[in-house]
């Protein structure tokens, strides 16, 4: 499944370097393609850069940090993208405050689950890719063009994915060209080969806890009426995922670590304040807690 992709500049064969060595011309509109041909050593190894060390072999992938779980929900007039904060390394917790959701331009954000190093490079390089195109062309990519650009990057990681270095993005955005502003929120999921799917159900999740998160969103999605209710449902979905998936981290009230979330609407992409996420997380935990969670003695009752 693919959109038409007219958002490309003409290639330039007059650039120095590989153009004179018989290689194809450089596509100026793609920063990743330009870098791959002019200075491939600056790219992540999985996307065409220099391979080095044991990380390029399948033998060491089990000890690399991995990140999970990302959820996205559409609401009238926009979309929410949220992620937990835990990364794991084998059966160990590698990090408790990892950022997995990134704003990539004014109207899109990506959340990536999988091998942490590749996932972070995906998000950063994709943001540069969008900015690079806008600077050269003078206008931003259409949402269809953004999807195709990310699909190309994911496909470029296929060789590494076959060795276990998988990183799968979840793209959320607001299509400013949509005829109906209330239904302009978009969620796009990808597979390891670069195939993509535009979600029509209104919610999606990736990562090891995705099956539990999607089940939770399926039950709670009818409660979504605006951005705030969508953020609450996203937090509940991550809480449910953390309850059953050891690689997903739930709200940590002791350390003050909470999921991160981004809302994207007609006003653009905005990070949800941590104070609001903390408030919603406490409400979710309180609503799930038994009356005697801390025992009868905590309330002064008789044994």
UniProtKB/Swiss-Prot annotation:
Localization per record: Cytoplasm
Catalytic residue positions: 68 (nucleophile)
Propeptide: 1-67
GO biological process terms held by the UniProt record: modification-dependent protein catabolic process; proteasomal protein catabolic process
EC number, as in UniProt: 3.4.25.1
Reactions catalysed according to its record: Cleavage of peptide bonds with very broad specificity
Encoding gene per record: prcB
Matching InterPro entries: Ntn_hydrolases_N, Proteasome_sua/b, Proteasome_suB-type, PSB_actinobac
Keyword Ribosomal protein among UniProt keywords: no
Organism: Mycolicibacterium paratuberculosis (strain ATCC BAA-968 / K-10)
Homology family: Belongs to the peptidase T1B family.
Entry keyword set: Autocatalytic cleavage, Cytoplasm, Hydrolase, Protease, Proteasome, Threonine protease, Zymogen
Catalytic class of the enzyme: hydrolase
Subunit structure: The 20S proteasome core is composed of 14 alpha and 14 beta subunits that assemble into four stacked heptameric rings, resulting in a barrel-shaped structure. The two inner rings, each composed of seven catalytic beta subunits, are sandwiched by two outer rings, each composed of seven alpha subunits. The catalytic chamber with the active sites is on the inside of the barrel. Has a gated structure, the ends of the cylinder being occluded by the N-termini of the alpha-subunits. Is capped by the proteasome-associated ATPase, ARC.
Database matches in SUPFAM superfamilies: N-terminal nucleophile aminohydrolases (Ntn hydrolases) (SSF56235)
Name of the protein in question: Proteasome subunit beta
A GO cellular component annotation in the UniProt record: cytoplasm
Primary role: Component of the proteasome core, a large protease complex with broad specificity involved in protein degradation.
Disulfide partners: none
GO molecular function ontology, one term from the record: threonine-type endopeptidase activity
Pathway annotation from the record: Protein degradation; proteasomal Pup-dependent pathway
UniProt activity-regulation remark: The formation of the proteasomal ATPase ARC-20S proteasome complex, likely via the docking of the C-termini of ARC into the intersubunit pockets in the alpha-rings, may trigger opening of the gate for substrate entry. Interconversion between the open-gate and close-gate conformations leads to a dynamic regulation of the 20S proteasome proteolysis activity.
Principal place of residence: cytoplasm
């Amino acid at each position: 499944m693919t959109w038409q992709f007219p958002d490309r500049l003409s290639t330039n064969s007059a650039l120095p370097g590989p153009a004179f060595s018989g290689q194809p011309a450089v596509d100026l509109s793609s920063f990743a393609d330009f870098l791959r041909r002019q200075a491939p050593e600056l790219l992540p190894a999985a996307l065409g850069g220099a391979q080095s060390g044991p990380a390029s072999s399948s033998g060491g992938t089990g000890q690399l940090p991995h990140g999970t779980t990302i959820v996205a929900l559409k609401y009238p007039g926009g979309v929410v993208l949220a992620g937990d904060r835990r990364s794991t390394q084998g059966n160990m917790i590698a990090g408790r405050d990892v950022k997995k959701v990134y704003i990539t331009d004014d109207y899109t954000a990506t959340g990536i689950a999988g091998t942490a190093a590749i996932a972070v490079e995906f998000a950063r390089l994709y943001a540069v890719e969008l900015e690079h195109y806008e600077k050269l062309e003078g206008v931003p990519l259409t949402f269809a063009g953004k999807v195709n650009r990310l699909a190309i990057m994911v496909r470029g990681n296929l060789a590494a994915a076959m060795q276990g270095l998988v990183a799968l993005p979840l793209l959320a955005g607001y299509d400013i060209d949509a005829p109906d502003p209330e239904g302009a929120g978009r969620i796009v999921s990808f597979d390891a080969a670069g195939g993509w799917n535009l979600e029509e159900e209104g919610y999606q999740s990736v990562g090891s806890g995705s099956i539990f998160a999607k089940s939770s969103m399926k039950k709670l999605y009818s409660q979504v009426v605006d951005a705030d209710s969508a953020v609450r449902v996203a937090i509940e979905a991550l809480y449910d995922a953390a309850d059953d998936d050891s690689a997903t981290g739930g709200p940590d009230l002791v350390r003050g670590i909470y999921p991160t979330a981004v809302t994207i609407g007609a006003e653009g992409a905005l990070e949800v304040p941590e104070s609001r996420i903390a408030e919603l997380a406490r409400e979710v935990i309180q609503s799930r807690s038994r009356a005697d969670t801390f025992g009868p003695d905590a309330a002064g009752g008789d044994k």
